């Protein structure tokens, strides 16, 4: 029981820090502010490409979330943990799409990879609930998951 109260209190603190800063007034309702950007978790499932298009339609300058440093990674992980209604995987705005790209790995017999046969040769990335949304996982782009959109705070806001 004590652990449940501790976890509940911890989530309350995270929620208040995400939604009660006053700076989030620069974001649209339902969006959370962090370091000059607004973020929102969408609890509908879409493919990576459809999620990116959906984010772009929300407003000019919106995209799937970009995670450029540890502080932002922690913020996004906490936001997804709090706002995701169906914990699983969530798309972020990272995709590898170079048809000439070769893996730098090795096969189990030690030979170098000189050929790659990946479906659509495209890898999209998401956050995994199993790691508290703190690690990126390569996923098939055509699968549908929840996603996080991000936008810059408008100048002068």
Swiss-Prot record:
The keyword Acetylation does not apply. This is Snaclec A16. Shows greater sequence similarity to the alpha than beta subunits compared to other heterodimer snaclecs. PANTHER family: MANNOSE, PHOSPHOLIPASE, LECTIN RECEPTOR RELATED. The keyword Iron does not apply. Heterodimer; disulfide-linked. Expressed by the venom gland. InterPro entries: C-type_lectin-like, C-type_lectin-like/link_sf, C-type_lectin/snaclec_domain, CTDL_fold. PROSITE patterns: C_TYPE_LECTIN_2. SUPFAM superfamilies: C-type lectin-like (SSF56436). Pfam families: Lectin_C (PF00059). It comes from the Eukaryota. Gene3D superfamilies: Mannose-Binding Protein A, subunit A. It is found in: Secreted. Coiled coil: none annotated. It comes from Macrovipera lebetinus (Levantine viper). Interferes with one step of hemostasis (modulation of platelet aggregation, or coagulation cascade, for example). Disulfide bonds join 27-38, 55-149, 124-141. Belongs to the snaclec family. Residues 34-150 form the C-type lectin domain. Keywords: Disulfide bond, Hemostasis impairing toxin, Secreted, Signal, Toxin. GO terms for molecular function: toxin activity. Its main location: secreted.
């Amino acid at each position: 029981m004590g652990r449940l109260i501790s976890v509940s209190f911890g989530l309350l603190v995270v929620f208040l820090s995400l939604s009660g800063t006053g700076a989030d007034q620069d974001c649209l309702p339902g969006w959370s502010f962090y370091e000059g950007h607004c973020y929102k978790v969408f609890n509908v499932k879409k493919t990576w490409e459809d999620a990116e298009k959906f984010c772009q339609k929300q407003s000019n300058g919106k995209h799937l979330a970009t995670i450029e440093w540890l502080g932002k990674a922690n913020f996004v992980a906490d936001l997804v943990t709090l706002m995701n209604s169906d914990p699983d995987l969530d798309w972020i705005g990272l995709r590898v799409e170079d048809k000439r790209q070769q893996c730098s790995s090795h096969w189990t017999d030690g030979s170098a990879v000189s050929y790659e046969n990946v479906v659509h040769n495209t890898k999209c990335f998401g956050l995994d609930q199993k790691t508290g949304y703190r690690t990126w996982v390569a996923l098939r782009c055509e699968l549908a998951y929840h996603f996080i959109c991000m936008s810059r705070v408008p100048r002068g806001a």
